[in-house]
Amino acid sequence: MNIEKNSILNIHLNPEGILRIVLNNPKSHNTLSEKMILSLQQSLDDAASDEKVRVVIIAAEGSTFSAGHDLKEMKAGRLDPDKGKSYFNKIMSQCSTLMQAIVTNPKPIIAEVNGT
């Protein structure tokens, strides 16, 4: 796994086996959009099965680690005919799966959070 950059995550594995996953949407304070959740989930799944990865560090660009769920995306979901019920069920299920991937991952996962 080398340096990988996309609009949501920057990922880099150094020679010592330290995988840095950097949330890269500082304009939205790194909100947990559906794309962010799915990208993180895939990255953690990949790390779990990669023998070169010894530890995972999740960091963030900008002054905010993450502001939580993307409220603009959630508001848009309410426009669906079911008033957002299926969207909310889907996004909460995806988020729950992501959190379980963090808890059950065989690699240690560290959150690098700015303390100011």
What are the functions of these language-model segments?
Residues 1-61, 100:
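Conserved CoA-thioester-binding segment of acyl-CoA-metabolizing enzymes
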Residues 24, 69, 114:
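Histidine-centered beta-alpha loop that forms part of the nucleotide-sugar donor binding/catalytic region
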Residues 96-116:
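Glycine-rich beta-to-alpha active-site loop
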